[in-house]
Amino acid sequence: MKKIGVLTSGGDAPGMNAAIRAVVRTGAYYGIKVMGIKQGYVGLMTDNMEEMTARSVSETLQRGGTILQTARCLEFKTPEGREIAYANARKEGLDGIIVIGGDGSFRGAMELCKAGFPTIAMPGTIDNDISCSDYTVGYDTCLNTVMEAVDKIRDTSTSHNRCSLIEVMGRRAGYIALEAGIACGAEVILVPEKEWSFDEDVLRPVLESKARGKKHSIIIVAEGIGGVMEMAKVIEEKTGIETRATILGHVQRGGSPSVRDRVIASEMGAKCVELLLEGKENRIVRMKDNKVCDIDIAEGLAMQKTLPESLVNLVPKLTV
């Protein structure tokens, strides 16, 4: 193993730079040349790569986003597109590739393995929705960003006796909504995984909150539920309580990564390099029971992940 490539793919997440840095510096430690592949699989398609050194990744640990940039590459999903990518990887002499991203990126990693390129994947996504891993890089920073935003919205909601709906990311998974909702003392948390009734699960808690003398109501809604603007209008019409909706959007993806994200990303990045050195391939580096370990990509993608029942059951106890 003399030369490897590293790419970030899909949505960006805080901590990706810490992972890239760990890959590059661990590679340098073992005498391996590391090529940074720009814009994810697009960089493989266009042969957009450059050598990275221990010095070139200095001052990146604290930066949000990804210094390699990222993109979604539909062409790589076609056999013809993949052949172009494989030819470029061969031309660069890559002995292995490390992919940082979500489940779609992992499927691309499996294709690379089939083509004869030893590939290791690691989870970098704010959604925390990788089935085989207890944690994904970027999640903690995202939660802190949401918490800070909701705390500020609460300040102005209290001043105006308002109900505030806040939409957070999570198209298919409600981890951000659930944990941020608990951390922010939300009266209502709506996630895609749980059935809900507008009258029982939204209107009733808002009215009960007002009856108890509270000066605000906070409703956290996962992106997969959506419709917060219309929901706000209906709440105001039916309760008479002034209601406003906020979509936090891409602010959740940015910002300097937290300590947790920097440390876990560094651990995972180093582990990726070491697995390649051990001759392993087609693996996902994951967090399981607070330990960094690995699992076969196909096996990992086939697993199911559910919201922690302990947290789901905690919500009604905290909203009395």
Language-model features, listed with the residues they occupy:
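Flexible, glycine/charged-enriched surface loops at secondary-structure junctions
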Residues: I32-K38, T156-C163, K215-I219, E242-L248, ...
